[in-house]
Curated annotation (Swiss-Prot):
Residues 39-153 form the sHSP domain. This is 17.3 kDa class I heat shock protein. One of its GO terms (cellular component) is cytoplasm. Belongs to the small heat shock protein (HSP20) family.
Length: 153
């Protein structure tokens, strides 16, 4: 592990993306606990890819270990897509001896401000093999009518 922090966390310049609502943690990659200890959980910091095609905005989130019934999708404030879920800590048996606990638990909340061309009333989602895919169709760009004008003379 490098002692020099990666200030952009390997993300694709989301610091410059006006639609991303991620909270930047400058201490995320340092070898000591962050002040935002909940952000240290791999589950809480679920990575989401967002691509735009000519027809839609497509989000893909890795959410292993959750069933589709445990994931909640909402459109808030008219244009904010919120993906949330929760993975609970496994119940502990007093007779068991744990040697390693690496699987993360906690709450997941990710929000993305959708652009004006998003059809928020037609959002579709599917989940397969721990990957959530959310498709937000786009409004068709209406080209202005072009009218030919005769030139006299």
């Amino acid at each position: 592990m490098s002692l020099i922090p990666s200030f952009f966390g390997g993300r694709r310049s989301s610091v410059f993306d006006p639609f991303s609502l991620d909270v930047w943690d400058p201490f995320k990659d340092f070898p000591f606990p962050s002040s935002l200890s909940a952000e240290n959980s791999a589950f809480v910091s679920t990575r989401v890819d967002w691509k735009e095609t000519p027809e839609a905005h497509v989000f893909k989130a890795d959410i292993p270990g959750l069933k589709k019934e445990e994931v909640k999708l909402e459109i808030q404030d008219g244009r904010v897509l919120q993906i949330s879920g929760e993975r609970n800590v496994e119940k502990e048996d007093k007779n068991d001896t744990w040697h390693r606990v690496e699987r993360s638990s906690g709450k997941l909340v990710r929000r993305f401000r959708l652009p004006e061309n998003a059809k928020v009333d037609q959002v579709k989602a599917s989940m397969e093999n721990g990957v959530l895919t959310v498709t937000v169709p786009k409004e068709e760009i209406k080209k202005p009518d072009v009218k030919a004008i005769d030139i006299s003379g």
